[in-house]
């Protein structure tokens, strides 16, 4: 093919207009500990910090890159395009540790991608000459650097490693078809033929251990997950539960095998360290186990609820029983008939159904001298042991619905289920199969809808519609999809994806769409994806052969929602549907026209001749949709597609869409097609962030105000850049736009603010210096209160200038502005002015008729009421679907208050509008998702029998609970009693077990600590012992614990990171940091040093008033009381926090803003995020991405995109 330049100029190539700069990249956990860091990396100047972080963290090759390279001579390949390998002679001059490193420049990554594609394209004669190859290389590097397009993640992970650096490895059992001979070959190298495909569909036979069977599938899946890809399978071939086996006996059923596959997938991170495995499980609606499949995730969610509740109740009541065994002396204390306290705790335990044998076990342990039982409390966090314990958490589930089933639902008809063996036997014998069971279709429909409402699964795939648009039905039906449901083709095939950033093709001056530039991009990226098929290796023989035979591609786009907003067009409108159809048609038909051009030179795909009439029928139907043909004109369709309505489409876009449709059909009829499929709409999760897209795939925006990451760390608030352009398109003046934008994102200054402004604060005692600090922090503040905390103002100013004691401003929930006399209404007014409302509703000058242009997937800000309906999501999908080979991966968001009937309507409308697949997500349908309404409903509700619980679990002796204590240094050591109370806390810090033991005085004050890390080696262990002794001596000489806490928290060294086994603390920067966080929380009430709020706990706090009693040589120890006592410090009273306060009182977090965990969830949801935390970096910036989640901070996803 002859290539022409479009974006680059000959003399300068790809870098002609690209400015480069050096940046640092650092991703941290919420506590400040480092997840990833890279310094002085070369990147395009225009890239955001998020894009830089994702490229550096996820897509840079981190090791194995030689410092010196040399070219490998190859006949017919120009020198600039030849492979490189390590230059061993030059490397020998370096120290061994300096010879290999990682990529440090975006240009290196772009070079290995574009160079590898160009190399394979040139080698197999995709270009007419060397000049065309050079143009192709330059244009691709330019498009990558300017964020116009990006390939799927496996390309970034794997492509070009061998070509650019000579990186290789042992073969992992892959296969490829040699392009020169057409013969299947087993790979001898891990990277010479890369695995660039993200999406796979695999078959499974009803066979346990042979090739192609059930256990073989898990091996094939593992091979895909290892290299960062996702896979889907239709499991309808597997026999149902109790279905007869050929050798006698009954089948264990489909579900038993799905659980094995779920466990296998859960154990693997996709791409090694990048993401967890992603898989799709499909099942036909006539399978005998369909009801169990539908209920799978609903049932597992119930198990999670039971595990969490049960663990908390067991921990509380069993420890209360153990404590009661030490309420009196002698053997009678173990007899509930003699020990009234023990009797009461047993009665309470039996009320909540604690197992009798566990109650007996605890009493037996107490009789043996044990004083505590470690009963881990599980949580509803989706990464917790509760979710890890149950099945069904590692796949997206979908049901294949036929037109016959949907008609049966419409008409309230019966629906038959069939044993697999009977169905196969009837097919062979040419008769009608006998049903194994008959249900009412509507009952099954109700079950599907309830499950989706309750657990967000199963999704639906419309089998008949999918196969009516199938280009190759002679080779079998389409049975399944990839995990995100955009790739739909034959079993044992693969698809590699790429997405265009539509925003790059909108001229921000004229607000016209650059049709010619978009066409050029679609042509080049179709060629890239086709070359990728040529160079690829695959995880099995079948996939290698069939992917080579059909050569399916997955070109798509992102940022459609932003483009519509920039153009001033509501997402939910006829204009949006028409423009979506036109853009999709231009992309799709340009890709098919390019495929036909390649077929002219390379020949059509192997399976084309057999399927020619079907494929041309499908292409003609695509063309008819571009012309908005009447329903009677379409061939072989039962549901009429949504065509491009000329009344609502800009004429130049409509003309281009129809021209491209004409060209694709005419070239295809003449030359055939090189590819059976060319387009999908993927969720573009991580790659969408690399391209700095505001919206992913076909999605609308999720918020109008965003928080942009700064290069030096932190965030600042910006308006979605689509908003001012959209307002300009709607005719608003610059001054009106400025007022509307300021209403949304805030003025970021106190000047002119109502009530709380510079003058008012000066009257309260604020100095000019402090006011400057406040002003400087306002652009970064989400809430005005964040600018008025001790970290920003300084403790000296608060104590000396404002006269506020440390005890007051350190107290949880302290608000300086309220303390200064401003009312909540005053603060809200000032907050709206300074920090913005986060919504456009009720903005000055904005006409209500223009509100729909700025509607988002969620309500915006705390005042926002508007959001896009599920119907609008479905309509925009319906507009694009007639111009997509595969399907559309999209989240259809529903509010929490959506009812089951809404789910039914959404699924039914999707079928009626010819959508191929649908996934719904109702806010709060996952138990793991924090939900504002739940927090608001339950906040402040206390347990009715609080006093009974206290009687059963807390020592009644109120000695020194409210005693005023003055702490001072004492020259003589205050000795601890020979027998002393205390507690033992076991935890794991960064994978290392730590045992912390405390010893206390009779009054409950801490007097000593013991630290044991018994597997860490003699030297380290001895140092920890010595450190514990020195701290203990200090405590016994009167050094306040608070001093140690201030000195040693945030102390950083290895081991560090994730903490498990502790209720409050989930992250620490070192073992020392963890120890003093734990002591501060237990003895000082410093919940700000933990990551889990006390209101999240259910009465398992370690009591700090522990009376000591002699009884048969054993001490009495309250192990799980409902009272936490704050350790006294100079001139402070000991504060007692009741159990009810623990539930309702918010804790400060460890962040400088001092907000609670509950508040953090609420704020995240106000910003448009889901309220979930990221498993990689801990931020609360998760958004829905297809049927998965994506972190807007570090780019991690819970799926395969």
UniProtKB/Swiss-Prot annotation:
One matching Pfam family is Ribonuc_red_lgC
- Give the active-site positions: 482, 484, 486
Region annotation (Disordered) ranges? 1100-1120
Q: Reaction(s) catalyzed by this protein?
A: a 2'-deoxyribonucleoside 5'-diphosphate + [thioredoxin]-disulfide + H2O = a ribonucleoside 5'-diphosphate + [thioredoxin]-dithiol
Disulfide feature: 199-495
Cofactor binding annotation = 5'-deoxyadenosylcobalamine (coenzyme B12).
MF-aspect GO terms = cobalamin binding; cobalt ion binding; nucleotide binding; ribonucleoside-diphosphate reductase activity, thioredoxin disulfide as acceptor
Q: Which gene encodes it?
A: nrdJ
Q: Which organism is it from?
A: Leptospira interrogans serogroup Icterohaemorrhagiae serovar copenhageni (strain Fiocruz L1-130)
Question: Any idea what job this protein has?
Answer: Catalyzes the reduction of ribonucleotides to deoxyribonucleotides. May function to provide a pool of deoxyribonucleotide precursors for DNA repair during oxygen limitation and/or for immediate growth after restoration of oxygen.
Top-level division of the source organism's lineage: Bacteria
Q: Which UniProt keywords apply?
A: Cobalamin, Cobalt, Disulfide bond, DNA synthesis, Nucleotide-binding, Oxidoreductase
Against PANTHER family, the record matches this protein to:
RIBONUCLEOSIDE-DIPHOSPHATE REDUCTASE, VITAMIN B12-DEPENDENT RIBONUCLEOTIDE REDUCTASE
Q: Which family is this protein grouped under?
A: Belongs to the ribonucleoside diphosphate reductase class-2 family.
Query: What is this protein's record name?
Result: Vitamin B12-dependent ribonucleotide reductase
The protein's enzyme class: oxidoreductase
Q: Where does substrate bind?
A: 153, 198-199, 230, 482-486, 683-687
Question: GO:BP terms for this protein?
Answer: DNA biosynthetic process
Cofactors that this protein relies on: adenosylcob(III)alamin
Q: Where is the composition biased (Basic and acidic residues)?
A: 1100-1118
